Amino acid sequence: MSLDITLYEYGPSRSKQARWALLECGLEFKSVSGIGILHSEELIKVNPMGKVPAVVINGEPLFEAAAICTYLADLAPEKGLIAPSGSRERALHLQWVSFALTEMEAYLWSNARNTFVLPKEQRISALIEQNNAAFLHAASVLEKVLAENDYLVGQRFSVTDILVGFTLNWGKGAKLLETFPNLQKYLERLKQRPHCTL
């Protein structure tokens, strides 16, 4: 099947996940990038929120990094980046991606909003401490899992690691992984991959 793929992306954002997945899948794509694309009329036609990442694949729009990366992996089954639908490993993919988004990334994003995204008068600095505590609790769960496993699903690299790895790398940048040696080793493994965008 011939694929016509356009990726809407901008530097330090979740669009790194989509780019990494495209590269791992070996799929050719066009890039529309730069800060000027954010909230533009062109991007809003693809993602009504005007945010990246977003893709158009054979004329069909799709947004949200987890959806994009999962779909891309399904489009390149020969790469073995995701288990078949209906398998336990596919359920584990959904489990860990949902876990990272709800139990970790949501708190990192709240910290960002209340540190530099929102205007000063709208920031709630009291949230930072409780957000960090929630993130650290979730990180302790992954620390135990990765003490016994090199990767999150099926003992091999998968699109799950692209999505969760991005969140953990964000946490590392916020200095929240300093007491988690297994998470740090996991990130180093991911960064060894030639297509890694972390």
What is each PLM-predicted segment?
Residues 1-126:
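GST-like domain detector, emphasizing the conserved glutathione-binding G-site
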Residues 45, 164, 192:
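Phosphate-coordinating loops and pocket residues in cytosolic domains that bind phosphorylated ligands
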Residues 55, 161, 193:
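Conserved G/P- and acidic residue-centered "switch" motifs that form tight phosphate/ATP-binding loops
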Residues 67, 182, 195:
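Residue-level recognition of oxygen-bearing side chains
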